[in-house]
Amino acid sequence: MDYFTLFGLPAQYSIDLPALTIRFQDLQRQFHPDKFASGTPAEQLAAVSQSATINQAWQTLRNPLARAEYLLSLHGFDLTSEQHTVRDTAFLMEQLELREELDEIDQAKDEARLESFIKRVKGMFDSRHQQMVEQLNNETWDVAADSVRKLRFLDKLRSSAEQLEEKLLDF
């Protein structure tokens, strides 16, 4: 059973997050291992396994990038495979330049420049994310898979920039 079916949701990117949360809580109550403490070892093991699946499904579906990757996996795209990397050299060059810029900001300890950098990367992420949503909604899976790969780069860059921000603020 796929994660969407487990939570009673349509297998699509745009989901009802409050409904996901309610269903998660219901499933957790229903399959919590403590409810099976007096059961047979097989029942206890099944409850632990089911609870782990519910937790994994919850973590996957509530995270936008993980949800997109999972949806694509249902359509035959294994984005964890080494064969599925970004081949867009212009995008990769841009990422290298952005990484170099972030290193320069770190060396200079320039908080104002970092704030501007974070806003720019967030804008790039948001724009690419909107494209990905449209691609998933239109079921252009191969193009959406490429967008997800690029979003991963931007997400890691944003995370690095935010870590630098914390480091500079602690100074």
Curated annotation (Swiss-Prot):
GO terms for molecular function: ATPase activator activity; protein-folding chaperone binding. Residues 2-74 form the J domain. GO terms for cellular component: iron-sulfur cluster transfer complex. InterPro entries: DnaJ_domain, HscB, HscB_C_sf, HscB_oligo_C, J_dom_sf. Keywords: Chaperone. SMART domains: DnaJ. GO terms for biological process: [2Fe-2S] cluster assembly; protein complex oligomerization; protein folding. It holds the Pfam family HSCB_C. Co-chaperone involved in the maturation of iron-sulfur cluster-containing proteins. Seems to help targeting proteins to be folded toward HscA. Interacts with HscA and stimulates its ATPase activity. Interacts with IscU. Belongs to the HscB family. This is Co-chaperone protein HscB. It comes from Enterobacter sp. (strain 638).
